[in-house]
């Protein structure tokens, strides 16, 4: 399933620090492969990795305000928390799945357990 962590509203030119996000992903999944070949607006930077649940992939929108995650929910929650930590506190961030079965605001300081509870309550 695909999940998204996306800035809601105007990001005022802000975009995620790609290097910091790459460092976090490679820190969790040491064998992660990074593909920086710009393939499309949605797939400007791609990370492929092996999780405990199987293969996973994350890719970044070229403006740096949306992270797409093709992973199991627990890995998507971890990635969304990392994305939130790298996002300015004054920007609103939403975490959802591709079918909008749930759509939750991801506040600064939210933990993985709290986000899991929000997702379970919304879904």
Regions found by a protein language model. Name each.
Residues 26-73:
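Short, intrinsically disordered low-complexity segments
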Residues 17, 79-82:
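Hydrophobic side chains in well-ordered alpha-helices
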């Amino acid at each position: 399933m695909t999940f998204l962590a996306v800035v809601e509203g105007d990001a005022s030119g802000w975009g995620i620090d790609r290097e910091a996000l790459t460092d976090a992903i490679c820190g969790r999944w040491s064998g992660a492969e990074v593909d920086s070949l710009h393939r499309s607006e949605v797939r400007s930077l791609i990370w492929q990795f092996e999780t405990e649940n199987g293969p996973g992939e994350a890719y970044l929108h070229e403006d740096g305000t949306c992270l797409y995650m093709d992973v199991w929910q627990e890995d998507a929650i971890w990635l969304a928390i990392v994305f939130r930590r790298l996002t300015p506190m004054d920007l609103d961030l939403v975490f959802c799945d591709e079918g909008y079965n749930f759509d939750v605001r991801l506040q600064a300081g939210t933990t993985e357990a709290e986000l899991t509870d929000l997702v379970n309550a919304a879904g």
